[in-house]
UniProtKB/Swiss-Prot annotation:
A motif (Important for interaction with partner proteins) lies at residues 167-172. The gene is ssb. Residues 114-172 are annotated as: Disordered. This is Single-stranded DNA-binding protein. One of its GO terms (biological process) is DNA recombination. It comes from Mesorhizobium japonicum (strain LMG 29417 / CECT 9101 / MAFF 303099) (Mesorhizobium loti (strain MAFF 303099)).
Length: 172
């Protein structure tokens, strides 16, 4: 096999406000829990069923951590892109435990807030961690733009925009 891919994309709702802590170096680390749900109709009873999965997300990317700390609140709908990582730890009795988390590393990952701000519809925006071509200027553009400074059109389509906001120009 030539290579492998470890990429996770989640769209869900925050189960609580972000938990922020600091490393000894002063860098922020943010923990969030995201709920994703799927629903279906039971073939036998015709009853609607729903299953919710809870995902632990850890943000090491300083720019994304600042955005999470300032703007994320319980119940908000978010888009998160990161890597799956499993870590081993020991509980108080010395038994080995394992935790699997979605991790946004220092120079990788993406966070977008999908709920409107103060009654606005559509996508609020987000932040992509990455190389030097991506800035840490969250909040300096309009409500329907996400931060993907690598070039091209903004990511995400948003919703609730009017037809006059649409750009008819082809992005390539």
């Amino acid at each position: 096999m030539a290579g492998s891919v470890n990429k996770v994309i989640l769209v869900g709702n925050l189960g609580a406000d972000p938990e922020i802590r600091r490393l000894n170096s002063g860098e922020p680390v943010v923990n969030i829990r995201i709920a994703t749900s799927e629903s279906w109709r039971d073939k036998n009873s015709g009853e609607r069923k729903e299953k919710t999965e809870w995902h632990n997300v850890v943000i090491f990317n300083e720019g994304i951590a600042k955005v999470a700390e300032q703007y994320l609140k319980k119940g908000m709908k978010v888009y998160v892109e990161g890597q799956l990582q499993t870590r081993k730890w020991q509980d108080q009795t010395g038994a080995d435990k394992y935790t699997t988390e979605v991790v946004l590393q220092r120079f990788r990952g993406e966070l977008q807030m999908l709920d409107g701000r103060q009654g606005e519809g559509g996508q609020v925006g987000g932040y992509s961690g990455g190389g030097s071509s991506r800035g840490s200027d969250f909040g300096q553009s309009g409500p329907n733009e996400s931060f993907n400074r690598g070039g091209g059109a903004p990511r995400g389509g948003g919703g609730g925009g009017s037809s006059r906001e649409l750009d008819d120009e082809i992005p390539f």
